[in-house]
């Protein structure tokens, strides 16, 4: 029988992790897969092991003189990444998670701007890190690798050293008292480094967000979560902490192409992802259903089960067992965030018995602002605002649409060394998100687009590019698209809604094997013009790739 979680409010991550280590001591916190040729080994790290390794590694960081300093973490999602990041948080070392995909110039610039004195990194980044080390442009004194490599400190040597120091009586790291209000994480927003902003977050804000999430979403200590979202993103790292606060086991994927295999291999029950991942899961399964000629049957059974559900008869997981098995067999809960999810996809998951909710948040809000839950789901919305937050719509238009602004403990401290940009978005304690939306009579929040992307036509009509992009992306022939406003050549006071489309070469060749390049473009344009769009579109620029 599944045991309901006990939700406790903490104001820092250290107390939260100590509570979890005590409550879920022998539960598995992380499982790591080690491949050696054809042989595969699974290493389980319990909650007790995790806290021990954090304290051992953190103690070594203190012995290196990093107390009160800053340390970067860069690499793929793994147990070592989690330990390095959490060791920073529990010891008052500002953690700077960085994107492993940055070019060397961008990575070096981020390291300089964040003023880190240590970096913990993945072996795959060895050449880049070595070049940065040799350049001498950063303040980094300690280069620590997850793997044993010449010229770098070894992660597990530091764990061994820290263990010995603690056994010899060293307790400075373990006894450190976290300041919940101080900057604890420095996160760069997405975009090129020259334009990205370094967001300062504190532990009280993150811990409050975790508490709010646990109050409205249901997690069990028997759940298994797969860490697809990169930990250097706030959505990924806070998601990791939500799982640790709930006693959940986290496993790591082998890559997007192995998603279905991994879901089955680990018996994954909870999946937190962005729409592109969730769309991929949906489309893969539905293509197989179509191939088997079962599309009409599935659609009929969805209508039937939804009707029975209104009578409080739930047959979904029995009737759609084959579809659920294609998602590993144990999937029960999916959380989507980071971008709008196609309404069809969300309805499909819920219709087959997998609870899917959408959330909305930003790096600057640690991150979740609102989310759907078991009892609060409304099509097209991103749920109800989190309990610790005040959310309102600023400068509403006639339709009640305006900028979403937020106030509460999980709002950032500001942008690091950028008072001007901080003052642009933080006014009287309210964070101005730059997102447009509205709150309906029931308190549900709806996102309509980005303020800076909004296209306003001469006749006053407002066009939200994101809505059109979702619609166009539904076409099988379309791989991706981009909607934007283009000045009207005939009227300088007006704009035209323009579209750029990348077509799916595999699909188009399969459906239209004898079509020329121009004929394919004509076919796609015809498909787009038949969409239910109440605005005139310029004929799109259609190509194979952006």
Q: Residue spans of the language-model regions?
A:
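Structural core segment of the AMP-binding/adenylate-forming
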Residues: 16-17, 90-161, 495, 505
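Conserved pre-ATP/AMP-binding loop-to-beta segment of ANL
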Residues: 25-28, 163-188, 195, 218-224
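Conserved AMP-binding/adenylate-forming core of the ANL superfamily
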Residues: 26-78, 82-86, 103-108, 163, ...
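ANL superfamily adenylate-forming
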Residues: 36-39, 127-179, 285-322
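Conserved AMP-binding A3 loop
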Residues: 43-48, 184-210
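AMP-binding/adenylate-forming catalytic core of the ANL superfamily
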Residues: 119-121, 408, 413-414, 436-535
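Conserved AMP-binding/adenylation subdomain of ANL enzymes
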Residues: 207-224, 231-320, 330, 355
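Conserved AMP-binding/adenylate-forming
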Residues: 271, 315, 319-445, 451-454, ...
